[in-house]
């Protein structure tokens, strides 16, 4: 470039140029410049490592950090925010959250038998026993199962220093120290002869609030082992369980547990201990004879259906197993014949070496005392009181050899070790169950007859009665167990026919399924199958008939119980009856989320908790209030814990607990009540009157059933309740369902009413009657103990004018009007309370009960014990906090349990408008009915008083005016 053509500032000062030359020169310069730049770039590329920083980079092009895409890759989405939108309470990166509510084994523990052997036993139904262990609270059921677990799992006790409580798998059960859920355990146990049996054992809660869990276990069992504390004897729940087992038609055996308490705690002489044990057996037999019609159902140690145990010290024996210890020690003894002489008023004469029914001398002891109790007393006394001197010699005589380290153990573990070596395995328990509890093959037929709604004589019924593993699949599930994280459920039940396979398509029939209405059914695919052993599960590919099984993948359509069958080719299959509980859920709480936007989470939690607890009821009131009904305070406390922590994980507000009420009448309707249909073409006339005492309970307990033929039904009511035969044969329905405590009777005369026309609308009238008795007029609660009589009916000739839309609401209205004309009253639930307390605390118990409208019915000492048992009744609405109040007044020495017992009329007239309910003031007794009704109606979003305009037609009101009937109801 010529420098003369440019000044010092680079401006062109030369001659003018032509535009073409200009462009050519500019193009050449640009081309040269581009080539130079390319060469420079290549040069930089070659030498940039040698001379970093020599290149010129503009400020805006400088790159100090790698981009997010270069760091994380193109698949990762990066978001840049200049403002923090997360609250401080929420972490920027949420930690991985794991939910675990159950205590489960991480791997399969070592057992004394092979798992393949267990699986092989499942195919032989004659070697299977399905047993439920039940009993009163803290009578030793769980501890007994621990002994069986120790016997079959040699390494488990080494990992647990304290009480094992192997079947308390929920953390809440461990914390509370009380069983909440029924837990199945499947183990292989040998009998005295060494023959192995597969035992499916259900460990059930002892608290009376959780008796619904016992019901679920009994339904799939063939027999019951009833645990009774030797010191406490027969208690509240013991009696209820005996009645329940007899009603379920199960074989009953007894295990008298904690016999060590008679020796170490009560310090009874051996003879008194025998009397105590005999008293328990006699008391149980008395209860069985009260509830059972089977005269052969007798419990006696001589028959082998009573065993004795002390779970804490690993003691378990029957007369036969103890006699075998003598036979093994001394030889040449027929232990079976020897066992027959070890109970009752039988004495051993050492001179003649024979047993006699008469005492040889005044100092002679009964054979049970001499051969069983005295050796047991000596063993316990030696270990407890004389460890250092004579114990080793005594143990050598018994053939028990302990090391020096074992002899230095503390008293309890040493005593447990000695007893374990002396008594050996729990073969006596196995003998008792094998002999007196039927196998699934033998027990199937009576169970099917009792629980199956279909015909027993059908092909399907015969397959179930034969426990046929090759027959059509029929499985009855009675329990739902949630997974460790509480997200899903597994169904637990018993295979009654056929074989269920993993991955098999099945048809799940719900509780409302019928052959006419198949809506409550769904096709599902079975996931995995397990055999449950409390804290671990054994996965299997198939489970044949007669066994218990835990099923994955079928939980979605199941609410409480279900029937699982094949999806095709089994169309005549019907359901098993839903569980019938021996208690009633009468305690009610209302719940709502603290944050209203979390309502869907709470609803999902309510659905899950409803599956988890068999007798729990959830419903929505007309006001939109979500209500939970349970059996007691502890029950609802556990429900709310699971709802908050396990299933919904939200904060939930709970209203003060209340109770459900019932509505009844105490007189006959003061006049005939009638109602016309909206089209004025039909008219129904009815009256209401109280039922005879005890009839409502007979209907609820299915002593009488509406499905009986008219002749049988008529004979029952005529003989037991002195009904007129015509009226007894004219019963149309029970209400509000087939076991409802109300009756609808057709009391019309053929000369006055067209029976054919009346029969054409029978179903509609029954439906209206059941609707009305389900929600009474006082406070939308169940009507109870009322008989409704149809006295007259005018029915339209044309079918169009007598449809269900006309008849059903009219029948409901006339039910209400007849009810209101019969002096309506409220009924409240009463609890039966059993209190254990020392003698000096009995007066305090009376005081606490009197303050809560309760009254004592029985006050007696427990035989052979320093404690008293006080039995009483208390209104459920006044029972909240009763247990805490009782312990406060007795310095923690009294212990109580309460359970629903009966309904009782609340004092006062609920429709007396002269009563003024003052806020924050306790009401006198005559005002209680009015207070309960008004507050219940307010809670449900109803008007404070009953409006008769809803239930009485204008002609009826005119009739009331003519009769000069005084009404307390607002118009």
Swiss-Prot record:
Residues bound to GTP: 135-142, 203-207, 257-260
Pfam families: EFG_C, EFG_III, EFG_IV, EFTUD2, GTP_EFTU, GTP_EFTU_D2
Phosphoserine modified-residue sites: 19
Comp. bias regions, Acidic residues: 17-47
UniProt xrefs under Gene3D superfamilies: 3.30.230.10, 3.30.70.240, Elongation Factor G (Translational Gtpase), domain 3, P-loop containing nucleotide triphosphate hydrolases, Translation factors, Yeast translation eEF2 (G' domain)
Superkingdom, taxonomy of origin: Eukaryota
Record location of the Glycyl lysine isopeptide (Lys-Gly) (interchain with G-Cter in SUMO1) cross-link: 63
GO function term, MF aspect, one: GTP binding
Domain tr-type G: 126-408
Record location of the Glycyl lysine isopeptide (Lys-Gly) (interchain with G-Cter in SUMO2) cross-link: 63
InterPro entries with a match to the protein in the record: EFG_II (IPR041095), EFG_III/V (IPR035647), EFG_V-like (IPR000640), EFTu-like_2 (IPR004161), EFTUD2_N (IPR031950), P-loop_NTPase (IPR027417), Ribosomal_Su5_D2-typ_SF (IPR020568), Ribsml_uS5_D2-typ_fold_subgr (IPR014721)
GO cellular component terms, semicolon-separated: nucleus; U2-type catalytic step 2 spliceosome; U2-type precatalytic spliceosome
Region named Disordered: 1-52
Residues bearing PTM Phosphothreonine: 85
PTM sites of type N-acetylmethionine: 1
PROSITE patterns, alphabetized: G_TR_2 (PS51722)
Subcellular location: Nucleus
Function text: Required for pre-mRNA splicing as component of the spliceosome, including pre-catalytic, catalytic and post-catalytic spliceosomal complexes. Component of the U5 snRNP and the U4/U6-U5 tri-snRNP complex, a building block of the spliceosome. As a component of the minor spliceosome, involved in the splicing of U12-type introns in pre-mRNAs.
Sequence similarity: Belongs to the TRAFAC class translation factor GTPase superfamily. Classic translation factor GTPase family. EF-G/EF-2 subfamily.
Name the record gives this protein: 116 kDa U5 small nuclear ribonucleoprotein component
Source organism per UniProt: Mus musculus
Gene assigned in the entry: Eftud2
């Amino acid at each position: 470039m010529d420098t003369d053509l440019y000044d010092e500032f680079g401006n062109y000062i030369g001659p003018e140029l032509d535009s073409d030359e200009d462009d050519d020169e500019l193009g050449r310069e640009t081309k040269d410049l581009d080539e130079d730049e390319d060469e420079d770039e290549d040069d930089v590329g070659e030498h940039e490592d040698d001379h970093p920083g020599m290149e010129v980079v503009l400020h805006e092009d400088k790159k100090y950090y790698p981009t997010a895409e270069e760091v994380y890759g193109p698949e990762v989405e990066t978001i840049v925010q200049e403002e923090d939108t997360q609250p401080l309470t929420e972490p920027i990166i949420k930690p991985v959250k794991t939910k675990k509510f159950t205590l489960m084994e991480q791997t399969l523990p070592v057992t004394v038998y092979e798992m393949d052997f267990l699986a092989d036993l499942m195919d032989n139904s004659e070697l299977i026993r399905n047993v439920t262990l039940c009993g009163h609270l803290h009578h030793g059921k769980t501890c007994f199962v621990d002994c069986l677990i120790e016997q079959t799992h040699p390494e488990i006790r080494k990992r647990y220093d304290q009480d094992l409580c192997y079947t308390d798998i929920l953390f809440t059960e461990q914390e509370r120290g009380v069983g909440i859920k029924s837990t199945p355990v499947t183990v292989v146990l040998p009998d005295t002869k060494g023959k192995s049996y597969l035992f499916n054992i259900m460990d059930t809660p002892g608290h009376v609030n959780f008796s619904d869990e016992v019901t679920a276990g009994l339904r799939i069992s063939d027999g019951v082992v009833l645990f009774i504390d030797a010191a406490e004897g027969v208690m509240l729940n013991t009696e209820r369980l005996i009645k329940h087992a007899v009603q379920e038609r199960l074989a009953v055996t007894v295990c008298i547990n904690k016999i060590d308490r008679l020796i170490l705690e009560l310090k009874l002489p051996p003879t008194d201990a025998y009397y105590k044990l005999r008293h328990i057996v006699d008391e149980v037999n008395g209860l069985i004879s009260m509830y059972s019609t089977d005269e052969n159902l007798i419990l006696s140690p001589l028959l082998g259906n009573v065993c004795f145990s002390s779970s804490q010290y690993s003691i378990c024996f029957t007369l036969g197993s103890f006699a075998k210890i003598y036979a093994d020690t001394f030889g040449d003894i027929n232990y079976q014949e020897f066992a027959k002489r070890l109970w009752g008023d039988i004495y051993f004469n050492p001179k003649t070496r024979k047993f006699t029914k008469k005492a040889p001398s005044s100092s002679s002891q009964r054979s049970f005392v001499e051969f069983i109790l005295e050796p047991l007393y000596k063993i316990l006394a030696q270990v407890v009181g004389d460890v250092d001197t004579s114990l080793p010699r005594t143990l050598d005589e018994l053939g028990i050899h302990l090391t020096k380290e074992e002899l230095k153990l503390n008293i309890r573990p040493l005593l447990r070790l000695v007893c374990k070596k002396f008594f050996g395995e729990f073969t006596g328990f196995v003998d008792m169950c094998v002999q007196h509890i039927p196998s699934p093959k033998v027990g199937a037929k009576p169970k099917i007859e009792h629980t199956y709604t279909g015909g027993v004589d059908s092909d399907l019924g015969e397959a179930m009665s034969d426990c046929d593993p090759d027959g059509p699949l029929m499985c009855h599930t009675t329990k739902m167990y949630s997974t460790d994280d509480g997200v899903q459920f597994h169904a637990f039940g018993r295979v009654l026919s056929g074989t269920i396979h993993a991955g098999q398509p099945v048809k799940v029939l719900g509780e409302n399924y019928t052959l006419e209405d198949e809506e409550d059914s769904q096709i599902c695919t079975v996931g995995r199958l397990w055999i449950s052993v409390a804290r671990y599960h054994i996965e299997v590919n198939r489970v044949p008939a007669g066994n218990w099984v835990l099923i994955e993948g079928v939980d979605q359509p199941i609410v409480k119980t279900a029937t699982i069958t094949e999806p095709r080719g089994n169309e005549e299959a019907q359901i098993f009856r839903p569980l019938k509980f021996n208690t009633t859920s009468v305690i009610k709480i209302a719940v709502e989320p603290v944050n209203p936007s979390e309502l869907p989470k709470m609803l999902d939690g309510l659905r899950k908790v409803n599956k988890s607890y068999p007798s729990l009821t959830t419903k929505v009131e007309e006001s939109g209030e979500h209500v939970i009904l349970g059996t007691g305070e502890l029950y609802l406390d556990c429900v709310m814990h699971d709802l908050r922590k396990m299933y919904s994980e939200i904060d939930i507000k709970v209203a003060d607990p209340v109770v459900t009420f019932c509505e009844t009448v105490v007189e006959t309707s003061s006049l005939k009540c009638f109602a016309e249909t909206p089209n004025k073409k039909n008219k129904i006339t009815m009256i209401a009157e109280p039922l005879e005492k005890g009839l409502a309970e007979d209907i609820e307990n299915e002593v009488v059933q509406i499905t009986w033929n008219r002749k049988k039904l008529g004979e029952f009511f005529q003989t037991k309740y002195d009904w007129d035969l015509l009226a007894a044969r004219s019963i149309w329905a029970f209400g509000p369902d087939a076991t409802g405590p109300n009756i609808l009777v057709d009391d019309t005369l053929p000369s006055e009413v067209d029976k054919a026309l009346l029969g054409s609308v029978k179903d509609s009238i029954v439906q209206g009657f059941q609707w009305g008795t389900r929600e009474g007029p006082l406070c939308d609660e169940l009507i109870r103990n009322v008989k409704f009589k149809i006295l007259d009916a005018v029915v339209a000739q044309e079918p169009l004018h007598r449809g269900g839309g006309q008849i059903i609401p009219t029948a409901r209205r006339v039910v209400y009007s007849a009810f209101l004309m019969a002096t309506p009253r409220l009924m409240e639930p009463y609890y039966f309370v059993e209190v254990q307390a020392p003698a000096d605390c009995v007066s305090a118990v009376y005081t606490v009960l009197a303050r809560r409208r309760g009254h004592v019915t029985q006050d007696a000492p427990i035989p052979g014990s320093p404690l008293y048992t006080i039995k009483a009744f208390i209104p459920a609405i006044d029972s909240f906090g009763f247990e805490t109040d009782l312990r406060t007044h007795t310095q923690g020495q009294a212990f109580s349990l309460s359970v629903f017992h009966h309904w009782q009329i609340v004092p006062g007239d609920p429709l007396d408008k002269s009563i003024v309910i003052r806020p924050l003031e306790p009401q006198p007794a005559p005002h209680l009915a009015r207070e309960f009704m008004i507050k219940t109606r307010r809670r449900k979003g109803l008007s404070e008083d009953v409006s008769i305009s809803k239930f009485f037609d204008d002609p009826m009101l005119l009739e009331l005016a003519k009769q000069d009937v005084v009404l307390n109801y607002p118009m």
